[in-house]
Amino acid sequence: MSWFDTTLSRLKGLFSRPVTRSTTGLDVPLDAHGRPQDVVTETVSTSGPLKPGHLRQVRRDARLLPKGVRRYTPGRKKWMEAAEARRLFSATLRTRNRNLRDLLPDEAQLARYGLPVWRTEEDVAAALGVSVGVLRHYSIHRPRERVRHYVTFAVPKRSGGVRLLHAPKRRLKALQRRMLALLVSKLPVSPQAHGFVPGRSIKTGAAPHVGRRVVLKLDLKDFFPSVTFARVRGLLIALGYGYPVAATLAVLMTESERQPVELEGILFHVPVGPRVCVQGAPTSPALCNAVLLRLDRRLAGLARRYGYTYTRYADDLTFSGDDVTALERVRALAARYVQEEGFEVNREKTRVQRRGGAQRVTGVTVNTTLGLSREERPRLRAMLHQEARSEDVEAHRAHLDGLLAYVKMLNPEQAERLARRRKPRGT
């Protein structure tokens, strides 16, 4: 604004009349003659030429305005107390930048998958048959805790090294078994998953690969530790659970590796890694199957594209087909899909089995039919021949009964031929 405009606006302010407005139309008390008791005049100072879009500054004393009837307005209902919000959205495991609708479950989505509707922690505690305090004792991740909920021990691997197992203690194991029956066993699983699924076994996982020219076997590295707390929580939210309930359930089914630390004479167990599905918890196998649903669908689509068949038993991925020229393409794309889904292929355990050699899937020979391999059948016949000469006849007989039952499950005709070589009892 130039000096001329400024001077002109000041001169107009000196000679202009104040703008007044009567407020008699307001809800004010009237006297006996029907006239308002108080009349408030608002003075508007026009500070310059008004243009469209300009604002006027109105100066008035609010104490002179008539007071209307006060109506009671109830306060907004709190979703949760401050302490509860800090516990659920602490920075250790849960982000605080959440939308309000994330607190609520999608009941239509839960009904679509046949899952129980749990809106709050109270619903989860009631379903598990414990108090809210007991549930929170197991469902809060602590940076240090004096009592461990898992017992950790090492089991040697056949390939060398050790495998760490984390067995939950009695009360936590009981809670996880109830969760397995109420929730985890109902989670959606792909048709290609054959491990830890009721009605499926190593036989159903190996049968689709019988008589194929080439069999490709891949192995997922660190299968259980790759399924983290965030994956489990995200799966439950996608299935329809609210954020607090999903976070509570995810903590119940995961655990982090902990290191004992002594501080001022008190022994604490401090986490040294993220919370993951542990091998030893009743919920881990079925939960990992549900987390791998999208990977199974992508790998099954890849197999169909090249005329292959795909199945998975736990962390063992198997492809089979008759087009040998597409083998390398399938292997490369499968490894890429696995990496995109947050897993890793164990290169040392990748195997390609052709028709001229032994083809085994989940420990079952699939060259021409399901059953024992050429090397295993003579070994079992020798064990049947030596049955009567064993020092502990009953123990040896029970072991052979189990082997024959296993063969009968895979191939009844092969088991019947082997059983004919067995001597009757008492001879």
UniProtKB/Swiss-Prot annotation:
Q: Which residues bind Mg(2+)?
A: D219, D315, D316
What domain of life does the UniProt record list for this protein's source? Bacteria
Residues forming the Reverse transcriptase domain are 136-366
Please state what class of enzyme this protein is. transferase
Entry keyword annotation includes Cytoplasm: no
Q: Which family does it belong to?
A: Belongs to the bacterial reverse transcriptase family.
Q: State what this protein does.
A: Reverse transcriptase (RT) responsible for synthesis of msDNA-Mx65 (a branched molecule with RNA linked by a 2',5'-phosphodiester bond to ssDNA). The retron transcript serves as primer (from a conserved internal G residue) and template for the reaction, and codes for the RT. The retron is involved in antiviral defense.
Name of protein: Retron Mx65 reverse transcriptase
Q: Which organism is it from?
A: Myxococcus xanthus
Organism phylogeny: Bacteria, Pseudomonadati, Myxococcota, Myxococcia, Myxococcales
